[in-house]
Every structure is written in C-alpha cells, then in structure tokens.
A protein has these predicted regions:
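Short, conserved catalytic/metal-binding motifs centered on acidic residues
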Residues: 3, 7, 42-53, 86, ...
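Active-site-proximal, Lys/Arg-enriched surface segment
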Residues: 4-91, 364-367, 375
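Electropositive, glycine- and tryptophan-enriched low-complexity nucleic-acid-binding patches
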Residues: 66-127
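Short, structured patches in soluble enzyme cores that scaffold and shape functional sites
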Residues: 88-90, 101, 134, 154-158, ...
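Domain-level cores of phosphate- or acyl-group-handling catalytic modules
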Residues: 106-163
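An anionic, glycine-rich sequence signature occurring as long contiguous blocks
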Residues: 151-253
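A short, flexible helix-boundary coil/loop motif
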Residues: 180-195, 265-376
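Short amphipathic alpha-helical "interface-anchor" segments enriched in bulky aromatics
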Residues: 240-274
Length: 376
C-alpha cells in the first residue's frame, strides 16, 4: 500500500485531464449499455453546486482562496479551497461528471460556466437541463446555458426581485392545482412568458409548489404538519416539461448534497489533503470521484436485486477491503522474529469468502427497505 507522502507526490504529478478522460470512458460505456436511463419525465438534469474541501490558517498555495475571519482575538486570514461539481441525475443512480476548482478572484458562477462549457464539449448529449440553487438564478448563467442549446433551472428565493413579486401576485389571483405526491400534498402554480427579467434574453417560466407533509418530532413524538414553499425559475416551456416534472427536477438538486458531497466526504474521505498543492488536491478528488462512480456502477449493474436488498454499499465496500487485505503479508508485532518467519503467510485464495463473511458480520448495517428493480 502506498504511503500518504507517495499518494500526495503522485497526485501532484498526474494531469487532471487524464483522470477526467477515464471518467468519461466510464460514462461512455454506461451509456452504451443503457445503464443511464432518464427519469420518468424524460429529461436528464446536470446539477451544479460548490463545495469547500479544505480550510486552514497557516498553509497557503497558489490555488488558495482567502477570507477574513472576525474573532475575539482579532481578524485572521483563512485560506481555503472550493470547487464546483456537476452530477448527472438519471433514473437509476446519480453519476458525478466533473469537478472544476474556483480560482482566486472569481466567484462560483465563473467556475460553473467553465465547467459547463467543458461538459458540453465532452458530454454534448449527456444532459438537457443545467440546474442549481438560488445563486444560479443569474442572467449570465441563464443566457450562457441557452446559448449552448441547453435549458436552465434554478431556485428563485430573492424576495426583492420583480420576477418573484410578479409571480407571487399571480399566485394570489389564480387558484392552485392540488397534487398528491410521495412527499405529501402539494399546491402548485405554473406561469410562463415572464419578461420582467430584462437581463435574461429569453422569457422565463416560474413554478411554485407549497408542500405540506406530516413529520414526527423527535422531542415529543407528536405528528406535525410541515409546510415548505418552493419557487423555481426555468427556461423550459410547458410543452417540454410538465409542472410535476419541473418540481421533481427542482427537488433533484439535493442529490448532489446527499449522494454526492456527503457520500464522498464521510465514506470516501475525499477532503483529505495528502499534499497542499492545487493540482494534487484536484487529482485526488477526481480519483475519488472515479472510484465512487465505479463502485456505484458495480453495485447497481453487477449485483442481483436480491443481493442489493440484503447488503448496502457499505457492506459491499467492506467485502472489497477484506479481499484486498487478505492477500497482503502481515508483519508480526513484537521482537524481531527469525529470518525464515519474518512475514506471516497471506491468506490462501480459498479463504477469501471467510474473510468476506467476517467483514460483513463484524459490523452489520441495516438492509435496504425496498428492493430495487432488476437492471435493464
């Protein structure tokens, strides 16, 4: 196994585009095998969002961003790294496409547009809609996305914008359409043809969803109605996407947080810094993204539905780890042994299944509640 210094040194020497090319080959094979089917509404969405991977007060490199932290002991300059990631939302499972670091002196949208252009060049037919949070509801992002032949979707939550004021006034004058979904009861409004956003070259569409669902409070165990008010702005016309499709695409934005950043940081330790250099940190994150995509594809495409119902991805990862360490020589602890017994014999090949069973039963995880359909 390579040491931490070796991992950092090698990642600093590797070109990031070479790792991106391998990830693109993985996408190409999955697409050819029809493993990336679109959702029920037929539109593939690429979610864009930023993530902060590292922050400290001492070390600084050429790719570090700076901010001033105000504290009781005075102001301190903090150095940190942020990047924009793009994740493809499909009908089967999400797939991370690419990562672009935010350079000093630029904002998140500038890095997102650079990442968007690279995705359109290398993944021209991978997605139909580029979606983001409220920060992406900007005219430069919408105009650039439309100029490349894609549609844009973002959360609209700035109460001072004329577009949101006009949409809310129309909602007060128009009766809502009630829809029962898996999330609960929703009251929906859908208006298109807004021209009160003069910086945007095309007329936009506003979709509002007031969702009510029952939640059980952890403190007293009582059920309580929770109301959430969501508003999205998009360039998708009503003839291309229904109201329910826009709502589902808007909620799919959380997949990059729950199944993207959360998975990579907590289970894959993608934020670990082996070497504080911009290229080394970027390459290691791209390698982690590639490993995550490979393991997810193996779990969904190579395992039978019955096995996926019994074991989750964490248990399968323990099986990988058990097989890896079972074939490594284990150095004996204590005083130096004789030369002929310096290392213990590795486990024989036929004992791999025993190591798998021990890895699974050591710390069992709860099985999945629902069985997934068989792969196409």
């Amino acid at each position: 196994m390579p040491s931490a210094d070796t991992v950092g040194r090698v990642c600093d020497l590797v070109e990031a585009d070479s790792v991106r090319h391998i990830n693109h080959e993985l996408y190409r094979h999955l697409k050819r095998n029809k493993a990336l089917a679109p959702p029920s509404h037929g539109l593939l969405v690429a979610i864009f969002d930023a993530h902060e991977s590292h922050a400290n007060y001492r070390r600084c490199c050429g790719g570090c961003l700076q901010r001033t932290i105000h504290g009781k002991s005075g102001d301190r300059i903090q150095y940190y790294h942020r990047f924009v990631a793009a994740q493809l939302v499909t009908g089967a499972w999400p797939l991370l496409l690419d990562v672009e670091p935010i350079q000093p002196g630029e904002d998140e949208i500038a890095a997102a547009l650079r990442l968007f252009d690279r995705l359109v060049d290398h993944y021209p037919r991978a997605f139909d809609v580029a979606a983001g949070d409220g920060l992406y509801a900007r005219s430069d992002f919408f105009n650039h996305v439309r100029s490349r032949g894609k549609h844009a979707l973002a959360v609209l939550k700035d109460e001072q914008r004329d577009l949101l004021k006009d949409a809310r006034s129309l909602c007060e004058q128009t009766p809502a359409t009630e829809v029962v979904t898996a999330r609960g009861l929703s009251q929906c409004w859908d208006f298109e043809g807004f021209t009160t956003w003069p910086q945007c070259h095309d007329a936009v569409r506003v979709v509002r969803s007031v969702e009510t669902r029952q939640v059980r409070r952890q403190l007293d165990g009582q059920w309580e109605a929770q109301i959430a008010d969501w508003v999205w702005v998009t360039t998708l016309p009503q003839i291309a996407a229904s109201t329910g499709a826009v709502i589902r695409m808007g909620h799919a934005r959380w997949s990059i947080e729950n199944e993207g950043f959360n998975e990579l940081v907590n289970r894959w330790h993608a934020d670990h810094v082996y070497k504080h250099q911009a290229n080394a940190m970027l390459v290691f994150y791209l390698l982690t993204v590639l490993a995550y995509n490979l393991s997810t594809a193996f779990y969904h495409r190579n395992l039978k539905p019955a096995l996926r119902c019994a074991y989750d991805t964490l248990q399968i990862a323990r099986m990988f780890s058990a097989e890896l360490y079972a074939q490594l020589p284990i150095c004996a602890r204590g005083p130096d042994p004789p030369a002929n017994v310096a290392f213990l014999n590795p486990s024989p090949p036929n004992s791999t299944s025993v190591a798998f069973a021990r890895a699974i039963t050591a710390r069992p995880s709860p099985p999945n509640r629902h069985c997934e359909p068989a792969p196409l």
